[in-house]
Design a protein with these regions (language model features):
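Structural/interface elements that position substrates and couple domains in central-metabolism enzymes
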Residues: 1-366
Length: 366
């Protein structure tokens, strides 16, 4: 099958490669490329352009006290409008970018009146996009049932290990995607609350509690994301929670659960910074955070919990030239199941491991 991909960035690049490696002919268009050339002869055209949030609202800066804001859909609307002009009813646009519930019908669907439109967001993580696409927990497709069925058949003929296809309205799929992401942040924030309790109470190892809960699969579900440590990060989860504050206000729900979660995430970063400052004062050492990106071995800083901690204390990043209080913010073991990076820290330094995995470090949460 010939398919098109508009938007060849952090998501579109590995996603389009995955389709190509699965045997499809993939035509790509990025900024400045011809959309008409990209969509010609394609049955499905995937749109993977950004839906950016205000730069202050991605999760690495303090924002729980700011007014809620929706994502910006200008880029998506521009691409859909241009593609619609050169497509027909024998083709289908497939948006995979994250949007808030209600967006497809309110902002986008009417722009695709010459063709067909589906919403098909992915449950992927930066650094493991191809692996996540090959082994998705579920594949979600919103929109016209006949085109949704055709897209499902395409996936079923690819090397995709998935037994669960969720098809529904735009609103159902928008909500499944966004609440899946924010449910993860809620789990992490709850685990880090237990970590804060351990630090305050004493005589308590956070891992004893979280492991007991993680193994309680009868009612509490999966053990994933049940390791206390740094806050949730990345280009999806924090900003999705932040944006849902806007939706709660827009729909006049009468409460702001996600504002509370984001406030808790920020306060947990503040608590960690306070602990680092106490060590810094006690030992007369500066504070250095090892790992500025939101995840080990990646350069992306979107929603970085390390940068969020730095908002609450005076510190530098990744400087091992002199003794310091070092926060070892990254855990390859927790994130990827790989061996942790070894640091050769200057003599006289203090290492703080919020993941409690290194024998030569102070375990935060014990």
């Amino acid at each position: 099958m010939i398919i098109g991909f508009i938007g060849i960035g952090k998501l579109g690049s590995p996603a389009s490669d995955f389709f190509e490696e699965a045997g499809h002919v993939v035509k790509r268009a990025d900024v400045g490329d011809s959309i008409e050339d990209c969509v010609k002869d394609c049955e499905f055209v995937f749109v993977a352009v950004p839906t950016p949030h205000d730069p202050l609202y991605d999760g690495k800066y303090i924002c729980s006290d700011l007014e809620p804001k929706d994502f910006s859909y200008d880029i998506v609307k521009d691409v859909i409008t241009k593609a619609n002009k050169v497509m027909n009813k024998e083709q289908c646009l497939v948006l995979i970018s994250t949007v808030l519930p209600g967006t497809m019908r309110r902002e986008i669907a009417h722009l695709a009146n010459n063709t067909n439109l589906l919403y098909n967001p992915y449950l992927i993580a930066m650094g493991t996009v191809k692996a996540d696409m090959a082994n998705p927990e579920m594949i979600m497709i919103g929109g016209d049932s006949e085109w949704a069925a055709a897209l499902q058949i395409m996936y079923m003929n690819m090397p995709v290990n998935c037994n669960r296809y969720i098809k529904g309205t735009y609103e159902e799929i928008e909500s499944t995607k966004i609440f899946y992401n924010t449910f993860i942040t809620m789990k992490i924030t709850m685990c880090n609350m237990i970590q804060d309790v351990a630090m305050k109470l004493g005589n308590m190892n956070v891992d004893v509690v979280t492991q007991a809960l993680a193994e309680s699969t009868d009612r509490i579900m999966s053990p994933k994301y049940m390791k206390a440590g740094m806050g949730d990060g990345g280009s999806c989860h924090p900003r999705d929670n932040i944006a849902l504050r806007w939706l709660a206000e827009e729909l006049d729900l009468g409460y702001d659960l996600f504002g509370s979660i984001i406030h808790a995430r920020e306060q947990q970063a503040s608590n960690m910074a306070k602990y680092l400052k106490e060590l810094s004062k006690e030992h007369d050492l500066p504070i250095v955070i090892m790992g500025k990106s939101f995840k080990p071995d990646l350069e992306y800083e979107d929603g970085s919990p390390s940068i969020l901690v730095s908002q609450f204390c005076e510190c530098t990043f990744d400087d091992v030239t002199k003794p310091a209080v070092f926060l070892l913010a990254h855990s390859r073991q927790t994130t990827f199941g790989k061996a942790n990076k070894e640091y050769d820290l200057p003599e006289g330094s203090i290492a703080v491991d919020p993941w409690r995995e290194r024998k030569d470090a102070i375990g935060y949460g014990v």
